[in-house]
From Swiss-Prot:
Stored InterPro entries: ERT1_acuK_gluconeogen_tf, PAS, PAS-like_dom_sf, PAS_13, Zn2-C6_fun-type_DNA-bd_sf, Zn2Cys6_DnaBD
The family this protein is said to belong to: Belongs to the ERT1/acuK family.
Claim: Cell division is one of the keywords in the record: no
Region (Disordered): 1-71, 161-198
Pfam families on file: PAS_13 (PF24990), Zn_clus (PF00172)
Name listed for the protein in its UniProt record: Transcription activator of gluconeogenesis ERT1
Record PANTHER family: TRANSCRIPTION ACTIVATOR OF GLUCONEOGENESIS ERT1, ZN(II)2CYS6 TRANSCRIPTION FACTOR (EUROFUNG)-RELATED
């Protein structure tokens, strides 16, 4: 029994020894396989081990390499394509444009320009179009004080077929276009409100404004007329409502006008009269009855549609110290001053909508829907009010 027990561990250790030796012998083989697998590299001569890759010849570029031209032709330059030095180039020959193959225009850098070239501005290029009259040129006789504005008006005139020709009559075959009347009455030297609509548009009208306005406009006269006018038309309650509305914005106006010098007020009046010129153009293009007046209510601009709606003549309203509230019914006057007081110093981009009853010269009422917007001057004072009406049928 003792001999058997002593031999049993030897019998059990034999397999472990053999397995360990086999594992030790197998480990170098596995490591050698891993090392050989990681060290496998692609041949440097470009050939592969497979038969398919060895059978294919290497790819080569067909033909000589294209050389970039020093200067592309006009068509290749416009298409942003590579050109060659030959004229005509191969691309133009293939496309059948060999006769028009010319050198492209290369813009010169500013530091390479001569003094004469810098002094001469490039004329604006206008492509010819058979739809428009051939007599159109970029130098149309418009005197708007701006080359860009002259060009735009010239293009519009050419589209409408009314390109101005100072030497001859207009084209009889062109459609006639109605233009807004331009009264030729000059400024009378006073900053009168009616003179704003009597100025011709453009740079000439602006120059007349700057020369004519020599003193500030007296707004107190308009409020004095209002105080005299109220007792003749309104009862005590309506007068009280209007006076309360005036008391809302009048102190703010006085406070903003206190630091202004006489030169500032003259400048504000010039800006006001200048804005009337531009507003007159807009009113002439609009078909809505429109009137513009000062913050005191004094009318300064009247559209022809408003005269057709109410029966008033333009000469009766402009230039005669006529006030807009004289054309309103009593209740409309009260509502207007209350709305003006609430929106005088608010956002000027919004309009105020209300109901209004206009009065004809005979006293006949004309019920309308009414909206007005308030424009401020450079000193942030409400200066110009633009009103529009639509009749209620």
């Amino acid at each position: 029994m003792s001999s058997a027990l002593t031999q049993q561990p030897a019998y059990r250790l034999a397999p472990s020894a053999s397995s360990s030796t086999s594992d030790i012998n197998a480990a170098p083989d596995a490591d050698s396989k891993k090392k050989t697998g990681t060290k496998r590299r692609r041949p440097q001569d470009g050939t592969s081990d497979s038969a398919d890759s060895s059978s294919q010849p290497p790819r080569t570029r067909e033909g000589p390499k294209k050389k970039k031209a020093n200067r592309a032709c006009f068509h290749c330059q416009k298409a942003h394509l590579t050109c060659d030095d030959s004229r005509p180039c191969q691309r133009c020959v293939k496309r059948g444009m060999a006769d028009n193959c010319t050198e492209g225009h290369r813009k010169k850098a500013k530091y390479l320009l001569d003094e004469e070239e810098l002094a001469q501005p490039d004329p604006p290029y206008v492509p010819p179009d058979p739809m428009f009259p051939s007599s159109y040129t970029a130098s149309a006789p418009f005197s708007l004080g701006s080359e860009g504005a002259n060009l735009e008006y010239s293009i519009l005139s050419a589209i409408l077929g009314n390109s101005p020709d100072p030497t001859g009559p207009p084209n009889s075959g062109s459609p006639s276009v109605s233009h807004a009347p331009q009264p030729s009455a000059p400024f009378n030297g006073q900053p009168d409100i009616g003179a704003g609509s009597a100025i011709s548009g453009g740079a000439q009208g602006a120059a007349a404004v700057y020369q004519a306005v020599t003193k500030p406009y007296d707004y107190t006269e308009g409020y004095h007329f209002l105080m005299k006018h109220l007792p003749t038309r309104f009862d005590k309650n309506d007068i009280l409502r209007i006076v309360r509305a005036l008391a809302i914005f009048r102190p703010s106006l006085i406070a903003l006008q206190m630091p202004l010098s006489e030169e500032d007020e003259v400048f504000v009046e010039k800006c006001f009269q200048r804005s009337l010129i531009e507003l007159d153009k807009l009113v002439s293009f609009s078909g809505t009855p429109t009137v513009a007046w000062r913050r005191t209510g004094e009318i300064c601009l009247v559209g022809p549609e408003f005269c057709m709606l109410t029966g008033w003549e333009k000469e009766e309203l402009v230039g005669r110290r006529k006030y807009i509230y004289e054309l309103f019914e009593n209740q409309s006057v009260v509502e207007y001053w209350e709305n003006f007081a609430n929106h005088a110093f608010e956002n000027t981009t919004q309009s105020v909508y209300s109901h209004c009853v206009l009065l004809k010269p005979s006293g006949t009422p004309v019920p309308c829907t009414f909206c007005f917007s308030i424009r401020r001057d450079i000193m942030d004072l409400p200066s110009l009010v633009i009103g529009q009406w639509l009749p209620l049928l």
